[in-house]
Amino acid sequence: EIIILPELFLGISLVYLVLHSTFLAVRKNYPLIQSSILYLGVLVLFLSCLLVLNDGLDVLEQSVLNDTIVNDYVSFFSKLVIGSLSLFCLLMIQPYLINQKINQFEYILLILFAVLGLFLLCSSNDLLTAYLAIELQSLAFYVLASFKRNSTYSVDAGIKYFILGAFSSSLFLFGSSLLYGVTGTINFEEFKDLYVNVSPGNNADLSNISLVQFGLVFILIS
């Protein structure tokens, strides 16, 4: 069984959707492309949820890629909830796109890229993988927040989100570098042992862990 099969399928499907929409844009109008991408996006997300259901319970508590990706109960149910909610949003998004006069097909692709980043974040088992997954979904959300270029509110929201995201990412990276310098590892399982066994007088370890936690909380709030 392949633990990251849903992520692999979603990533390969996204590459196909990008190529499909790019070549189709030469011959067709954007509204037609958007409808095609929307239906294909719903199908891809539905199949990804099925892959999570089909393979998730069979490979629980297993890891791949040198323990950077893990499949446990938390990641399984988190991916299932994220995939279901995203599928529900895609099914309801067409009236909003028509009402807001958004004809660009990239809107759907950005949502799928954000879902891919969230899937990887749920399965990440070290700081580097978690950071890359956070940045993948954050970049998609930056563009989605400022997608309506003619709206002052949309552009303002995108700029504020970008600044907050950059600040929280810097805190996360700074705390991660300090933790790696002190412990020599970036694995979450080893961090759990460190957090449990850290002595009360060791303020350096506690402050480094607090920086990473503060960065994660700041990312979630923003």
Say what each PLM segment does.
Residues 1-222:
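Alpha-helical transmembrane segments of multi-pass membrane proteins predominantly involved
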